[in-house]
Amino acid sequence: IISGIDAGLAKLQWQRFAAGLYEPFGLQVIDNKIYVTCKDRLTRLHDMNNDGEADFYESFSADTDVSAFFHAYNFDLQRDSKGNLYYVKAGQYTSRALPGAVIKVSANGKKRTVHSTGFRTPNGMGILPNNRLTVSDNQGSWMPASKVSLLKPGVFYG
């Protein structure tokens, strides 16, 4: 957590809020709770005693499709106007059957669905007006150049 933000940025101070997360790559703050996309799950962090550090790491949505391959991360974290969360999984060379996918997690964390597939090593997501999603992907076997895609549900982008 950072404090001391002013026009000069001369007195910034950092404080660790959480440690030990499994390769976190995305973050959202919703209703003063921090949500983190990790390699194995979407975690909601709770500061139970208000001391500025997370005391409880809630498994908000466990990922059932985890690979040990070094590119197999869950990237970014976006939220739509209905409270649903989205992250994107890398896919090329992973040991999973799912070929790199945008995952939609319901607002209560109980339902995970595949939005779209075909991403090698995505390195960013965005959400536009009307809940339109974008994903940038790195080049690779499926794609000869890096690109940004405006997503539609059910489409393969590789």
What would you call each of these model-derived segments?
Residues 1-158:
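Beta-propeller domains with acidic blade repeats across secreted/periplasmic ectodomains
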